């Protein structure tokens, strides 16, 4: 492929200084960002006669022009390169697609502080513990905290509305400060102990509780002493389950395994010498990328992520050494304005943690490769059965979900040769049709999917329709209209359930000929079709349920004059749900913040009809 780029002419203008270069394709998209200590030397290497790397050959064949930015130092170049990669997400760079902010446990600054799950900017006044590797780890920790420390986890609106203890008090998971079941001093003491525990100082917590238990026993307050005893026993059980290292402090331990184009970075988050959590990352790696670039790109993007800068430890231990390690240390230290070191040759506890991280990374890659190979085999068998001339690169499946015609949602899921490609999934809220008309819903969904399709768009090789011949005919009609001027169109296949609707009894129908066929119930090709069909059904029904719930809550309350989103939210939170709002008296409605007695009467009358 020729793009008209004159490399020799361009190289004559390039400086030998440090800097960053951006490579563009003919459409003006940035396809690669790189940095160099000597730009002229680095860029010249792309245009040698013998390029051994397939990735580099493919990259060079698409270059239309190159922009260069000079920097004061190699460290500055490294930081600017990272900024450009985040900005442009070039297809030939290693990309860490991890745009979620990290979750925390939040302890509020309130007369009676609450513990809560938090994700997002740290704006509210209080104490933030974390970040945790994922939301599940936070929820698990909060559940544990309820058993150890009777501190409220309800929101402030619910707290203010209580006139008697809730179920959490009956379960001994909250001391009910909302209704005065505990003194402020006792509650504050539990908050202090919980805070120490979240900081990893469980030995100090146990020591303080032992002292309180002995004091209570001396004063013959045996019931209180028994509560402290139970709390101590629970804390000791938790402490015994945690792996502890005596002198490691705070650090991240990273095991790396890279094989067959799949890279896994398994991180152990060590805080106060304990495994605080773990998480695997799978950066997008272009084919033929060397391990040096994979390591450097991941570490730079991960540790300069704005969401985690507040809690980056000073020390990182990683399983692989690489050439630019010290330059990367300097760049991250400069960006964060704090000491940052990367170690690869470690002993004792650090070596033990590193072996654990590396084992997890290796197992993760092997599992992915096994899954990838299984999916690949299923694709090959499906291609043979369908007698296709070219490999299947993309499959899509549509499904419709509604309840008696209410809140109809269509789903489109996408599979490539590695399995589900969830970034490409789409949902369509269906509007303007007769409720329950699945044919009209399918027509609208397919029309919207291919409304602006052209030869450069993402055209599926196979398009599955979860339904019978009627829906398939509608879909085929729309596809014929949309692709009339294009050389390629998807092959439509309907997936009709058998009379008993049992898996394995599906009938498959070609959209163009309407001829049908079936596969053996143990056929791997059928399993692939069932997988994409089931995934489409799951994605559709989840979207439908979410839309239905939102519609029911919103339309019922917001149709009442004077009730907007804020008052609707206050009513639902304060009273616990729509049914509770419907069953509430005027007096109960008037207790909700922002609801006057007149407004309460209006709501009561509207909901009671």
Curated annotation (Swiss-Prot):
Superkingdom to which the source organism belongs: Bacteria
Keyword Coiled coil: no
Any Pfam family hit: UvrC_RNaseH_dom
Quaternary structure note: Interacts with UvrB in an incision complex.
Gene: uvrC
UniProt source species: Shewanella sp. (strain MR-7)
Gene Ontology BP terms: nucleotide-excision repair; SOS response
Protein name, per record: UvrABC system protein C
Annotated signal peptide: none
Domain GIY-YIG: 16-94
Family: Belongs to the UvrC family.
InterPro entries xrefs: GIY-YIG_endonuc, GIY-YIG_endonuc_sf, GIY-YIG_UvrC_Cho, Hlx-hairpin-Hlx_DNA-bd_motif, RuvA_2-like, UVR_dom, UVR_dom_sf, UvrABC_protein_C
UVR domain: residues covered: 203-238
GO terms for cellular component: cytoplasm; excinuclease repair complex
Key words, A-Z: Cytoplasm, DNA damage, DNA excision, DNA repair, Excision nuclease, SOS response
